[in-house]
Amino acid sequence: MAPQNKVTTSGKDNNMDKQKALEAALAQIDRAFGKGSVMRLGSREKIEIDTISSGSLGLDIALGIGGLPRGRIVEIYGPESSGKTTLALHAIAEAQKAGGTAAFVDAEHALDPVYAKKLGVNTDDLIVSQPDTGEQALEITDTLIRSNAVDILVVDSVAALTPRAEIEGEMGDSHVGLQARLMSQALRKITGSINRSQTLVIFINQVRMKIGVMYGNPETTTGGNALKFYASVRLDIRRVGQIKDRDEIVGNATRVKVVKNKLAPPFKQVEFDIMYGEGVSKMGEILDLGVKAGIIDKSGSWFSHDSVRIGQGRENAKTFLREHPEMTEKIEKMIRHNTAEIADEMLDPSIPED
């Protein structure tokens, strides 16, 4: 028995020595690099992730945390005219509604202030930059993030971040890997600042086709692989259909897939309407999510809630909800109470991560 007690005492002493050595190491790091350079995760005052709404109720549910995460990088990519900039502008509008400051780095030189205003963006307070080169765009991005005064920053788009050497060179000159190196260097530099400033940084990206790919997905995004690694959330947005009013096309049916999510389970997908001149249709989302949650009954082409007929056909039902805000608000509250059930239905295991 005596030797056993000896071993136990020796083990306790060893643990105490380890603890003292750890405390000394932590104190040394704090002295060298400043207080808070290293800490126990449980000692942090706030562990929950702050979010900014995407402007789409369905997408907020699919993201699993109630919106787009602050202090992180988000990539929105897809084909041309799929709604990438529209989604980013909706996020800006939501941030501004909450009293935040927004910035838009317009590398494509294609921002339409009239359309942005229609989506709810306060264009008078929006900080806009139209840089000449990719280096200039990313330097401006870095400076705005380091100011700790910007809540959301959108870069539109990665494909338009042209390196200075390419702009100053001749047409036809080869500049292999220049843009990828530029993005890789910039992301290494700004990631720490983004986390400290709690800025939501959205990079809009385009898709390209890989040449000679016979099997698997031939699509890839521009700017190399760095953004894929640094992004906490990657959203693939696609136009999947047209919305018509008789013979006139008035909008697009849009599908967004969460192909990467470091903060909640990924591989969820959501569909919503993007109406021309209006953006994401809130009424359309409430209608679709209400049906998914069993709050709105759909019988044939008729929609009803609490035995009250909302309308025949989707567009008529949307008009009814628009004209009855009390019912719309009630249904929206019920949807928000059933987010877990709705999120389970959004799972799409077929989504590949490229």
Curated annotation (Swiss-Prot):
The entry's localization annotation reads: Cytoplasm
Keyword terms, alphabetized: ATP-binding, Cytoplasm, DNA damage, DNA recombination, DNA repair, DNA-binding, Nucleotide-binding, SOS response
> Which CDD domains does the entry mention?
RecA
Record-annotated residues binding ATP? 78-85
Per its UniProt record, what InterPro entries does this chain match?
Answer: AAA+_ATPase, DNA_recomb/repair_RecA, DNA_recomb/repair_RecA_CS, P-loop_NTPase, RecA-like_C, RecA-like_N, RecA_ATP-bd, RecA_C_sf
Q: Determine the domain of life of the protein's source.
A: Bacteria
- One Gene Ontology molecular-function label: single-stranded DNA binding
Query: Looking at the keywords, is Iron present?
Result: no
The GO biological-process annotations, alphabetized, read as: DNA recombination; DNA repair; SOS response
Where does it mainly reside?
cytoplasm
Its GO CC terms are: cytosol
Write down the PANTHER family for this protein, in alphabetical order: MITOCHONDRIAL DNA REPAIR PROTEIN RECA HOMOLOG-RELATED, RECA
Q: What does the record give as the function of this protein?
A: Can catalyze the hydrolysis of ATP in the presence of single-stranded DNA, the ATP-dependent uptake of single-stranded DNA by duplex DNA, and the ATP-dependent hybridization of homologous single-stranded DNAs. It interacts with LexA causing its activation and leading to its autocatalytic cleavage.
HAMAP family documented for this protein: RecA
Record-stated family: Belongs to the RecA family.
Q: What is this protein called?
A: Protein RecA
Task: Tell me the classification of the organism that encodes this protein.
Answer: Bacteria, Pseudomonadati, Pseudomonadota, Alphaproteobacteria, Sphingomonadales
Protein encoded by which gene? recA
